[in-house]
């Protein structure tokens, strides 16, 4: 999947999310989307690197301490 396909998937999901609101006002969707994407991204990257946080942080383009904070936030061990 390339970046354009990922973007299309996000747009389709958001379109469905707004339809499902059924007139209710949306709230904090940025945080919702980031949380829905960030946790599995971190989990997958850690799995890909066999749990190596330094390699995962490098792949993600994050500082290792930032990765650790995000792991704590999402309860990832």
Set out the residue ranges of the language-model regions.
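Bacterial C-terminal helix-turn-helix
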Residues: 1-5, 12-13, 19, 24-77
